[in-house]
Amino acid sequence: MVETKLMEEQRWGPVWFIPGQNKGRYPYCHSLYIEGAGILIDPASDRERLIQLRKEHGVNAVWLSHWHEDHLMHLDLFDDLPLWISEKDTPAISSVETFLDCYGIEYHGYRKYWRQLLEEEFHFKPRKPTKFLQGGQTIDLSTVTVEVISTPGHTPGNLAFFFREPKVLFMGDYDLAKFGPWYGDRYSSIEETIDSINLLRKIPANVFLAGHETGIFRGNPGKRWDDYLNVIFDRENRLLQFLNQPRTMEEIVEACIVYGRPREPKAFFELGERGLMKKHLERLTKAEKVFQEGNKYIKNAAIQKGKLIPNPTTTDHK
């Protein structure tokens, strides 16, 4: 049964944390609202609450941390308002077909599933941004100063927001959840994901806000950063172990290295498994730790049996 009870709203000066339904788990996320300026960030928390928020306090513009559907589910409520997003993430919201292309969805049946899902559950409508948010920008909203931070990897134009006066950092989908980072889109990057996480952990914030699940971390999350990064290396190590013998892409996907077991709907979970494994194969092939022979992948024989990839997070950041 889906848990529908909401977490409590929290406020740090003009920065309001609006919890998502089901504790911000997909397909929901936590939203932010900036009082005074009327800025709403990532409108996919709770539809009724967002309607109430606009009616009682006013919403003047919507900002998106990135283009994913679970961060714009209720954007349709604000069709008449200015929309700000990074330029690199803009193409994905320009049409349903481009959205699917950015996910790397090729199979016709999966595209049909996602097309229906986007339109019916996520109320997707093509949008053209009013302005572009750029990493390095400092925006004075009168009630608070916002530093826009470029955090690519999850998506090419992924953004975080540091609210200077209350020292609050919104990390978006770098959520420190046990599942680990997502970097399975067509234009995602493992290397950029690692760099962005290591950038965020150094921000001098008193409060770290994430787009999903726990949502609020008072003080630096500490070991949670390493645990989060380690998921990347654990996935890679398991893949390397699986490639002790030649494997096709289909065999790799069926091994369920990411999700642990076959799950439904396949159009969602098989797509995710394939996307993440593809990124790891690209990374391992580039490092010559894996070779491709025809339609099969195999671990480089020069890698000693049982020797795993060193985990840089265990020594680089304490």
Where are these regions (language model features)?
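Active-site neighborhood of phospho(di)ester-bond hydrolases with catalytic His/Asp-centered motifs
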Residues: 41-44, 59-70, 83-87, 150-153, ...
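C-terminal regulatory/interaction regions
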Residues: 238-318
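A short catalytic or substrate-binding loop motif that flags glycine-/basic-rich loops and adjacent residues
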Residues: 24-26, 133, 152-155, 318
